[in-house]
Each structure stands twice: as structure tokens, then as C-alpha cells.
Amino acid sequence: MIRADLTDIPTYVPGKNLGDALKLSSNEVAFPPLPAAVSAITEAATGANRYPDMGAVELRGVLADHLELTPEQITVGCGSSALCQQLVQATCAAGDEVIFPWRSFEAYPIFARVAGATAVPIPLLPDTQGHDLEGMLDAITDRTRLIFLCNPNNPSGTTFTEEQFEAFMQRVPADVVVGLDEAYFEFNRAEDSPVSTEAVQRYPNVIGLRTFSKAYGLAGVRVGYAFGNPELIGAMNKVAIPFAVSSLAQAAAIASLNAADELLERTEEVVTERERVAQVVGAAPSQANFVWLPGEGAAELAGRLAEHGVVIRAFPEGARITVTNAAETDRLIRAWEAVHHG
């Protein structure tokens, strides 16, 4: 009755939430949705008896203006994670290969396996914790259909440069799709980092992926967007679940896009606190809303911080700590000092 290979597919594990503890394990923002988004959600709720616009025409139009693309180059989904899944399904058949950095977004190997594809993880560079772009190129075979790049990378917070990306793309076969995952784009202050809206204009095999879950504070309503070659976008739409993006999510996203100044102010606070947290915990520079502590002992560190009311994310390769606002940073620092100097 059930696919035999499902037993071997890992289950996605979300960040822990321990009661009243400070949750710094899921890269959520501390502030609520923008006021305009809250108002839009409230208004849209009165029409919740009707199906949402399956084509998200208004939202795609606003996104087109925001991104300087055409609506035909854009699709929306139930978070960028759903769009990653659609991209795998649109490009891969059983036995095809999906290359991605590792450690990176935890769901990449899951998406590949669910589609019957082979997951090909390429370890991060040990000295920088960045993408091993050369190693990813070396891993390409005649079965490779898709490569995910995560920029900034989750959980390391590292980025690659425009020059590195261009050199990479020059060697990627034209029939291999590159998904440029920019879930943390709004927190990225690296001046030499590639931007997917520009990349998709140069490369028909590049798809940009972004979300409203992080900087926009809409993780609970689930809405993201992808953009690129209309042919690829159309293929992604073919494998989408109908009516996946609710009317509330579409309304909230439109309102959020129209409040860019407020968003910038909020992300600047995160950037300021990011430097503060990195200095206290000894983390390398990050371009996302978290910092990364590579190495062993992450589970022990997470356990000790939890005893002091702070929840972080422990991976086998290291610990990730979400960065939010000044008040929560103060609380994190108190717990950190209690663990290390108490």
C-alpha cells in the first residue's frame, strides 16, 4: 500500500519550541507582520468562504513591479519550500540527480527523494563553511537535472560572490536547472553577492526562489515566490497543488510589498543585532538572520542553553542561533554568559 522507499526518506525536523523559552531555533523574526499586512489579513478573512485566486494575478502583478520582471516570469507557492519541491518535480524523474550544498536547507534531500530522484550532497568548504562550487561542478553527470544554491546559506550564513557565481554558471550545462534559493535575501548586506533577479535575465536555466516567511514575518500564512524563464515557471505550475496560496496569504504579501520602507527598518535591526551576537558567541560573519557555530558539541550547547530558557538549533555539524531584536539578544547573552561563565 505504501511506497517502500518512504521508510528511507528523512523526516523534516522543525526547530524546537519549549514553552516560555526564547525560541531562536527556526529563523523566525520576533516582530509581528507589518501593520498593513495585519489589516489586509483581517479584511481578506471576511471572504474566506471563497476559493483564493489560483493564479494569484494581483500578487504576481505587484511582484512583477517589485522585481522588474513580467508576471509570466513569476509563480507563487505555499512558501518557498513548496516551490523548491515543485522545481524538483518539474525537472526530475526517477533516478535523476539533484545536487545541493550540505549542510544547507534541511529539506533539499527530502524534496529529491520524494520525487524519486537521487540526492547528491556536496559538503561545505571546511575553512569558510561556504559552497564548494568546484565540487558541485565536479559532481555533475548526465543524470543531473537540478542544482540548488542557497545564498545566503542556511545554516552557515555564508555567501558566494558574483564572480564566483558567473564562473560557476559558465560551466553548468544549459539543460541543468539552477535553483538560486534566496530565502534570506533581505538580510544580505554583501555588496558582491549575485542577485537572482539579474541572474534569471542572463541565464534561462536559473530560477530564483524567495519567501515572505522570514524578513516579512509571514511564516504562519505560508507564501513564497519563484521567478525566471516562463517555460520553467509554467512547468512548476503544472505540478502545483491547486489553490495552495490562501486569500489571506496573498493579501498579506501584497500589503507587505507595498511597505518596503518599514521592512528595511526591521531588517536593519536584525543586521545590527547579528554583529552583536556574532561577537559574543564567537561566530563567523553571517549574511542571514542567524549565526553559525561549526564543530562538535552543538547538542550539548543547545541543552545547556535550554536550561537557561533559550532554544537554539543543534545539527551534527554545528549550532545555529537565530538573531532577532535587542531585547532577545540581551536574553541570549545572559544565558550564554551563565553557561560559559556562571
Curated annotation (Swiss-Prot):
Gene Ontology MF terms in the entry: aromatic-amino-acid transaminase activity; histidinol-phosphate transaminase activity; pyridoxal phosphate binding
Names of required cofactors: pyridoxal 5'-phosphate
Residues annotated as transmembrane: none
E.C. no: 2.6.1.57
Root EC class: transferase
Residues with the N6-(pyridoxal phosphate)lysine modification: 214
Biological process per Gene Ontology, one example term: L-histidine biosynthetic process
PANTHER family: HISTIDINOL-PHOSPHATE AMINOTRANSFERASE, HISTIDINOL-PHOSPHATE AMINOTRANSFERASE 2
Name of the protein in question: Aromatic amino acid aminotransferase
Organism per entry: Corynebacterium efficiens (strain DSM 44549 / YS-314 / AJ 12310 / JCM 11189 / NBRC 100395)
